[in-house]
Design a protein with these regions (language model features):
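Short alpha-helical segment of the dimerization/phosphotransfer core of two-component systems
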Residues: 105-110
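Short conserved segment of the HATPase_c
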Residues: 216-230
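Conserved micro-motifs of the catalytic ATP-binding
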Residues: 125-130, 163-166
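Acidic ATP/Mg2+-coordinating residue in the GHKL
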Residues: 211
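Membrane-proximal HAMP signal-relay module
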Residues: 1-65, 80-87, 122, 227, ...
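Short helix-loop "hinge" at the ATP-lid/N-box region of the Bergerat-fold HATPase_c
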Residues: 181-186
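Short beta-strand/loop element within the Bergerat-fold HATPase_c
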Residues: 191-203
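C-terminal end segment of the histidine kinase catalytic
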Residues: 254-289
């Protein structure tokens, strides 16, 4: 009677040692062996959870490397083809310009890709975020200055006088990526409009970027922040997108203790929402515009 539970405990230990992390003793008694078995099973459950997490992390890294390699290989192959055409000697001026334009466009896209990748990796460090009070008006003014005009898209800003505590550079990058995506969704559509707004609600500053563009199918919404995931690859690449923009936005939001929320309807538009706590009121000069 005494050795039976010990035998089961030994067998469960052997299973775990052999890589079967689902092994449990299943012993339920009101004595010291029962307490030992309960502790062993709890330890085994924790080990199994941690191993599953590590396996999932390895899969994510493997998928990321595969996607990144693909994103590099696809334009590089085409660029080599166009470069070979240029090296072959004098060609039709229109063909030469087409080749040069393609190489320039893809080079800029790869530059953007590498920059976003470096920012993503940098967000993993403990001191990646340097929060300070900043107003929505200052953020929106910076966006209006830095974003190039989007042909056929009206860009509107609606600040509410909210002040948040955020890393200004990162938060501007987050909003800029959302605005670029919204403008891209409106590309080629009559009456395209993107509204960047902020409102105070329940102690938070709620930022929204809304467009009346092509919208996103419901099945794609849960995957939008996956690195290199693109709803429409041809549209994204044609607009210079890398598939890392929303992944970067999600990482920046997470570093600020918040998250992106998406609402979208195909052919009607998309609204992205992200909230930050309002900064405590204090007498201070308005930060430079």
């Amino acid at each position: 009677r005494l050795t039976a539970p010990l035998t089961r405990l030994q067998a469960a230990s052997a299973r775990i040692a052999g890589g079967d992390y689902a092994g449990r003793t299943g012993i339920k008694t009101d004595d010291e062996i029962g307490a030992l078995s309960e502790g062993f099973d709890a330890m085994a459950a924790a080990v199994e959870t941690r191993v599953d997490e590590l396996h999932a992390a390895v899969r994510r890294e493997r998928d990321f490397v595969a996607a990144f390699t693909h994103e590099l290989k696809t334009p590089m192959t085409s660029m080599m083809g166009y470069a070979s055409l240029l090296r072959a000697g004098p060609a039709d001026p229109a063909a030469t310009k087409e080749a040069a334009d393609f190489i320039y466009h893809e080079t800029r896209r790869l530059e953007s890709l590498s920059g976003k990748l470096l920012t993503l990796l940098g967000l993993e460090s403990d001191n990646a975020v340097e929060p300070a009070p900043v107003s929505d008006r200052a953020l929106f003014a910076a966006l209006a200055r830095s974003l190039p005009p989007a042909e056929g898209v009206e860009l509107q800003f609606a600040p509410a006088g909210c002040t948040v505590c955020a890393d200004r550079i990162l938060w501007e990058d987050l909003l800029a990526n959302l605005v670029r995506n919204a403008c891209q969704a409106c590309r080629g559509r009559a009456g395209g409009r993107v509204v960047v707004a902020c409102r105070a609600e329940a102690g938070c500053a709620v930022f929204t970027v809304a467009d009346n563009g092509c919208g996103i199918p419901a099945a794609d919404l849960p995957r939008l922040t996956e690195p290199f995931y693109m709803v429409d690859k041809s549209r994204t690449r044609a607009g210079g997108g890398s598939g890392l923009g929303l992944a970067l936005c999600a990482a920046i939001a997470a570093r600020h203790g918040t998250a992106l929320q998406f609402e979208s309807e195909p052919e009607a538009g998309t609204t992205v929402t992200v909230a930050l706590p309002l900064a405590p009121a204090r007498p201070t000069k308005e930060e430079p515009q």
